[in-house]
Regions:
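Short aromatic/hydrophobic "clamp" motif used to bind/position activated sugar donors
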Residues: 148, 344-345
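A short, conserved alpha-helix in the catalytic core of glycosyltransferases
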Residues: 220, 230-258, 287, 360, ...
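Glycine-rich, basic loop-to-helix element that forms the pyrophosphate-binding segment
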Residues: 126-143, 329-338
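Conserved donor NDP-sugar-binding/catalytic core segment of glycosyltransferases
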Residues: 160-191, 351-393, 458
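Short, acidic, metal-binding catalytic loop of nucleotide-sugar glycosyltransferases
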Residues: 83-92
Length: 471
């Protein structure tokens, strides 16, 4: 069914006039769905609002330099952005605005006026356009804070954004911190909240899930070299890949609070990736460079159905012997290993994997940090339920109420990412990793993934491989 829908969508998009007509017809229905989901989320948010730690309890209170490149920014958006920083409950910040040679003089004047009213605002005006990466790096060079925060010129921060981030730095000593976010429309109305997991390496290589709000150590940023202008349009994602390669997982922290409001308006990347086609090429190059830096062989392909996502196939240069066994709580890992000599073992309830599919999953199962690999699960409620290993239970409950038009739900149904303990109809595991488990471990997906996670392995969900009975 998903293939048929994909082909139908492709045919409609190929006919420009038909595509436009269908989009117009769907506007009222989409608005209805969005309003329904907004109401559900509003109720949930009122029930789950948390207060940040008290400032007085923070032993470390680092100065945070907020870098904002501007270019012909609509004045109302610019003022709202600055006001959201001024309203912060955390006092130790500076706001550095770097105007990237705006052609609209009203932008220059608005920045000067704001600087007169806000002592912590430092304006800089470039005489030549350097694009976002160049303007950001210029701002970083002027910063005096121990940490650098990235903020877009038309977005806004939650009043407690910096306090939550500072509290996380104080508690963990993290060098890189990111938060949850929500999109908002041109009128400032929030919609499409995005609930993120803690550090998730495979997720970051499928889609830039970190995006906003990102705060990083200035020393670390200096060491890795700032933003790279050759990746214009995806400079933040490329930077995040570089930063996280330089860190240990415990140095990366996630604040599970919606603290950033990403404004969607005409031609913004948040609204439509195809509005900036050069971004696509930059994303591909960033992911390929990341693979090279990690010294792994991969094939990077843009997802044909979901253009903001990427599929990364690992090539380890060998074919594996494989075998298939049924899940059985009365059978143990020790008994399984006595019955087969295969290098890769597929444990399943009923689904069949072709030889090609099994080899595809095996390349992931052979990776050092991956325990079990899970192909696509067609039961969407089960996919969302498995998120309880990486998201808060209340968020999982919320997602079960929402439709696929929820960005969070959609991304977790369609992207590759790491999980913990899960319940799945099919998993693929390397023999060497099964051999490291207690021999009396029962053959169930939950028991196997729990034991593997206990050994430090991650589970990998790969929805791009569909068992044959589910096609």
């Amino acid at each position: 069914m998903s293939y048929i829908l994909h082909r139908l969508t492709h045919l409609i998009k190929a006919n420009r006039h038909l595509h436009r007509a269908v989009r117009c017809l769907l506007v009222p229905y989409r608005a209805h769905l969005d309003n329904r989901q907004r109401r559900i989320y509003d109720v949930w948010q009122r029930q789950h609002t948390e207060q940040p730690p008290a400032l007085s309890l923070l032993a470390q209170q680092p100065r945070i330099s907020i870098i904002v490149p501007t270019y012909n920014t609509p004045i109302p958006f610019l003022r709202e952005m600055v006001q959201s920083v001024v309203a912060q409950s955390y006092p130790h910040w500076e706001l550095i605005l770097v105007d990237d040679a705006s052609t609209n003089e009203t932008t220059h004047q608005a920045i000067r006026d704001l600087a007169e009213d806000v002592p912590q605002l430092k304006p800089f005006f470039l005489d030549k356009n350097r694009h976002i990466a160049g303007a950001t790096n210029y701002g970083i060079a002027q910063a005096t804070g121990e940490y650098i925060a990235l903020l877009d010129h038309d977005d806004i921060l939650h009043p407690d954004a910096l306090l939550w981030v500072a509290a996380m730095i104080d508690r963990t000593g993290a060098q890189f911190v990111y938060t949850d976010e929500t999109k908002m429309d041109e009128h400032g109305r929030p919609y499409q909240p995005f609930f993120k997991p803690d550090w998730n390496a495979d997720f970051l290589r499928a889609v830039n899930y970190i995006t906003h709000f990102a705060v990083m150590s200035r020393q670390l940023l200096t060491e890795v070299g700032g933003e790279d202008g050759s990746y214009n349009g995806t400079q933040d994602w490329e930077l995040f890949l570089r930063l996280t390669r330089a860190l240990q997982p415990e140095q990366i922290a996630h604040v599970p609070q919606i603290l950033y409001y990403w404004r969607v308006h005409q031609a913004s990347t948040a609204k439509d990736l195809d509005a900036k086609p050069y971004v696509i090429d930059a994303q591909r190059r960033a992911l390929e460079a990341d693979s090279t830096a990690r010294q792994v062989q991969t094939q990077v392909e843009r997802d044909p159905q979901y253009g903001a996502q990427w599929q990364m196939s690992y090539s380890l240069g060998q074919a594996y012997s494989t075998d298939t066994a049924s899940f059985d709580e009365s059978t143990t890992v020790g008994q399984l290993l006595e019955a087969t000599t295969a290098e890769m073992i597929c444990l399943t309830q009923h689904n069949a994997l072709s030889a090609a599919m099994l080899q595809h999953l095996a390349t992931d199962a052979a990776r050092p940090m991956i325990g079990a690999v899970v192909p696509r699960i067609t039961d969407e409620r089960q996919v969302i339920a498995n998120l309880s290993s990486i998201l808060q239970p209340s968020v999982v409950g919320l997602l079960q109420q929402l439709s696929r038009r929820s960005f969070t739900k959609h991304i977790y149904l369609t992207a590759r990412y790491n999980l913990g303990i899960i319940d799945a109809p099919t998993v693929v595991v390397a023999r060497t990793k099964l051999a490291a488990l207690a021999p009396d471990t029962p053959l169930t997906s939950a028991q196997i993934t729990a034991a593997l996670c206990g050994k430090g392995y991650n589970t990998l969900y790969n929805p791009h491989v569909t068992p044959e009975e589910d096609v």
